[in-house]
């Protein structure tokens, strides 16, 4: 048996294993980065839609904040010359099969061509907190006292991107929150 040939095969095998490990690590990190960017894009799309809707609260005659709670807000606003209702709410009992942490966030109201539309988004959390002051320090549950509204949204990837140290799946996540002070609600 040739010792040089055996050593060459051993070194070649180790080199091949190290290249495969490197390739695996690059692919895993690429997947994590892509998942993270997708979640950030989803949050950005939700941010734009929610921001556009929140600016309309109290806009027009008979426009009003109809009701709200921790995970729901419904209001009427004047859109293209008509009073229309818009609501954002978590759908109870809904879940996404690939990620048990996600529930369905539903937006109902006019969209694009003025027809009512129902848009659904998988989210981890959607929270509405109303305040009776513009600074967002005094919470209120009375819709007539609302002067500012804090909206918080958290999303996660549909598929796990790895495992936590305890063995549970790890999902890419991104969140956003903003305090809205609708001009038509400030007196």
Positions of PLM-derived features:
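Aliphatic-rich helix starts adjacent to a transmembrane/signal segment
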Residues: 2-56
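An alpha-helix initiation/capping motif
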Residues: 44, 68-69, 145
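Type IV pilin-like appendage domain
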Residues: 67-138, 170-175
